[in-house]
Amino acid sequence: MMADGFPWLTAIILLPLVASAFIPLLPDKEGKLVRWYALGVGIADFVLMCYTFWHHYDASSATFQLVEKYDWVPQIGFSWAVSVDGISMPLVLLAGFVTTLSMLAAWQVNLKPRLFYFLMLVLYSAQIGVFVAQDLLLFFIMWELELVPVYLLVSIWGGQKRRYAATKFLLYTAAASIFILIAGLAMALHGDNTTFDIVELGAKNYPLALELLLYAGLLIAFGVKLAIFPLHTWLPDAHGEASAPVSMILAGVLLKMGGYGLIRLNLELLPDAHIYFAPVLATLGVINIIYGGLNSFAQTHMKRRLAYSSVSHMGFVLLGIASFTDVGVSGAMLQMLSHGLIAAVLFFLAGVTYDRTHTMAMDNLGGIGQAMPKVFALFTAGTMASLALPGMSGFVSELKVFIGVTTSDIYSPTFCTVMVFLAAVGVILTPIYLLSMLRQVFYGTGAELSCNINNGAYENQEDEGTACFGTDCLLPGEAVYRDASIREVFIAASFLVLIIGVGVYPKIATQLYDVKTVAVNTQVRQSYTQIAQSNPQIYAKGFFAPKIVEPEVMAVSGMIK
């Protein structure tokens, strides 16, 4: 029910969208007023989220809260239905936090600033809409609405191959989202009543064959967004060409839509099919971890290396979802939140580095840590978080996933051991490619007495208008020595404070969703028990779980032993 009779979630969704409509009316050609206006709207919406959840959300309840439902097209059962629970509420806060800081990170945008901030606010609303939609058709509309601003943000404000990267992103995600629409229609039309309400869809009984088809289709749709191998190839191109603020949202929020969809629809609505697909998810998770790590190490472009790092880290989300344990599913949720913060700050700092050096080629960098010590220190802290250093949020989330897989009583010990061992190999790769990136970019001997910039000799290395770092000295002539500004330090520090806070005291985050993840995992385990009784060969032959043994009847007492 609506708290105090006020539609809080609707207000949170519509505030950025309605505010974006006034941007063309602002008397501002250079964008100075527009950026302050957009930032103010973002802050106001985030404050509204915090107020709403602080006063009207009960973290001890696993049910949907702040429910709003208004009939939209009653003839087909379509309604404006929104709500939050332990799965969606933390992701709403993540979206608000990352998007607001990304608008602050875009302070230097001077190309079509009105259009840029208009698209950022529309994207803000679409992200929130995806996470709070309780109607599957509304979920699909919000999912599609998010594609348009991202496409334009990449294709207009991106790099040299921006149109290729934006088109690839659009084709992948739009084609995959067709499966959401098909699955939604199939579930809505099944049975006697036609409805798109997610709660009512979860109460329907689907034939197992239909569930398996629905699960497979949704896995493809969400797998593209989550960058699951082999559906991930759009991600490195998009990150490589997108501006830093857009990359912050891509890695910090949009990837998490895929993980959210898997938990919300695949696990909650199709638990029987999840029993059969869980080993596939676990295997894909391990492949993601290793494949992403190896490819990341092979990249010489800084943002492409970080993009493949995201592919690797999303493998832990799949492992946790497939673990059948409370701690594993909780770890998957924490990994999404943790990676959202870590990836956002790393892509932001990569953008800060690019603003100074005008290159993402790590081979052309080296020694810039001497000239930009603040950027170096912040980048090092973000890197330590990404490689799961104890005391950082990444360590807690990955540890919980490992514990979840190790303690799973559904799979056989052999399968658990293989999965944990292979995932551990991927964890070993992480410091290799991240620390080597730090070495290439920030360490080195510093500037030489003479260096070649744009094929021109610069003898005076004291000129602050010239940046000649490292041994190659192939930076553009417009590169500068300038260290991080107060604004840039504030943005990075805002992320790092949360990363360290969750790493030191994980309950800051886990208390928001643990009740819900336990409820979801309990539902899936109940489905496993029912299926195992009727099909004792499930996960048989020793590779997965042992065969279910029939209860033994005691001859004397007639009791079940």
Curated annotation (Swiss-Prot):
Bilayer disposition of the protein: Multi-pass membrane protein
Main location: membrane
EC number: 7.1.1.-
An example Gene Ontology biological process: electron transport coupled proton transport
Enzyme class, first EC level, given as a word: translocase
Any Pfam family: Proton_antipo_M
Chain segments annotated as transmembrane: 6-26, 36-56, 87-107, 115-135, 136-156, 169-189, 209-229, 243-263, 274-294, 311-331, 332-352, 375-395, 418-438, 489-509
GO molecular function, one term: NADH dehydrogenase (ubiquinone) activity
Compartment(s) of residence: Cellular thylakoid membrane
Source taxon at top rank: Bacteria
Keywords attached to this entry: Membrane, NAD, NADP, Plastoquinone, Quinone, Thylakoid, Translocase, Transmembrane, Transmembrane helix
Annotated GO CC locations: plasma membrane-derived thylakoid membrane
Catalysed conversion reaction: a plastoquinone + NADH + (n+1) H(+)(in) = a plastoquinol + NAD(+) + n H(+)(out); a plastoquinone + NADPH + (n+1) H(+)(in) = a plastoquinol + NADP(+) + n H(+)(out)
Family: Belongs to the complex I subunit 4 family.
PANTHER family for this protein: NAD(P)H-QUINONE OXIDOREDUCTASE CHAIN 4, CHLOROPLASTIC, NADH-UBIQUINONE OXIDOREDUCTASE CHAIN 4
Role: NDH-1 shuttles electrons from NAD(P)H, via FMN and iron-sulfur (Fe-S) centers, to quinones in the respiratory chain. The immediate electron acceptor for the enzyme in this species is believed to be plastoquinone. Couples the redox reaction to proton translocation (for every two electrons transferred, four hydrogen ions are translocated across the cytoplasmic membrane), and thus conserves the redox energy in a proton gradient.
The protein's name in its UniProt record: NAD(P)H-quinone oxidoreductase chain 4 2
Naturally occurring in which organism (per UniProt): Trichormus variabilis (strain ATCC 29413 / PCC 7937) (Anabaena variabilis)
Organism phylogeny: Bacteria, Bacillati, Cyanobacteriota, Cyanophyceae, Nostocales
